[in-house]
Regions:
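Short beta-strand-loop/turn "lid" adjacent to the catalytic site in phosphate-handling enzymes
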Residues: 2-6, 17-52, 85-95
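Active-site nucleophile and cofactor-binding loops and adjacent substrate-binding regions
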Residues: 5, 47-57, 78-80, 96-101, ...
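Glycine-rich phosphate-binding loops at beta-strand->alpha-helix junctions
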Residues: 27-37, 196-197, 201-225, 241
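Glycine-rich phosphate-binding/hydrolytic loop that grips phosphoryl groups
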Residues: 57-65, 106-111, 118-119, 123-124, ...
Length: 251
């Protein structure tokens, strides 16, 4: 079982798979780049190309059983990888769509800003940051005594990067705050979208998975908070970045 990012070095992957041919007589491939490897090895060995969404569904079912010791209930599965897709678990699995926001957007943005490509380093910096040094909250707009806005709504984000004004001295803006804000912006938008979709399908359980959430406590806190506000249950499974690979292995 091997799980890889979309932007992985394909030549290195092919070398790795070539070295493993003596140990295995069958390869199962899934994901957007799976076709490249399936085509490469199809004439040499038993190679199968699997539907990405079906593989993820099977992987999540397996991880849920291992983590919770029971079958997966009716749920909305939100897989945040390079991009994001939604799967509805309700009498089977159904792909509902997704978003371009995710790890690909995040890594591309921090590469443009800071010329870094280390995800874990970015997370460490973000943990030291404070998004509200640059993000505009509703409470920054409405006066404290304004009865039109309740206490919960005051804590919502009115505008990501909303405190970065035209005359701001950019040298005063901290890298840690920007990366923190960026992660929160992704989480808030995906969390809001997921909760609206879940409500439309009368779903209470939201299962969040994918490589972007690996050791990403900031996103986990944001997604949990949004679910709590919307009276939904946020579920995070260990090793969920491997759900596609697990599903492919078991197919």
């Amino acid at each position: 079982m091997l799980s890889l990012s979309t932007q992985s070095d394909h030549e290195k992957i092919i070398d790795f798979l070539n070295n493993k041919k003596k140990s295995f007589n069958k390869y199962n491939f899934t994901g957007g780049k799976g076709y490249i490897y399936h085509k490469k090895f199809l004439k040499e060995m038993d190679s199968t190309l699997l539907n990405e969404f079906q593989a993820h569904a099977k992987g999540i079912e397996t991880l849920y059983m291992l983590n919770k010791k029971k079958a997966i209930p009716d749920s909305l599965i939100i897989n945040i990888g390079t991009g994001t897709f939604l799967l509805l678990k309700k009498q089977g699995f159904k792909h509902l769509g997704g978003s371009a926001l995710g790890g690909g957007f995040f890594m591309g943005f921090i590469k443009l800003l800071y010329n870094t490509h280390d995800f874990q380093e970015a997370l460490s910096l973000a943990e030291k940051g404070n998004r509200y040094n640059i993000d505009l909250k509703v409470s920054d707009i409405y006066e404290a005594m304004d009865h039109r806005v309740n206490l919960i709504f005051r804590e919502f984000t009115a505008a990501s990067f909303g405190k970065i004004k035209y005359d701001l001295d950019l040298s005063t803006v901290k890298k840690e705050d920007i990366i923190n804000s960026l992660i929160c912006m992704i989480g808030e938008n995906l969390g809001t979208m997921a909760n609206l979709v879940a409500e439309n399908h009368n779903i209470k359980n939201l299962i969040f998975c994918g490589g972007f959430l690996k050791e990403n406590k900031i996103s986990e806190r944001i997604l949990s908070t949004i679910c709590k506000i919307n009276k939904k249950k946020a579920i995070f499974l260990k090793n969920s970045e491997f759900c596609g690979a697990i599903g492919a292995l078991l197919s």
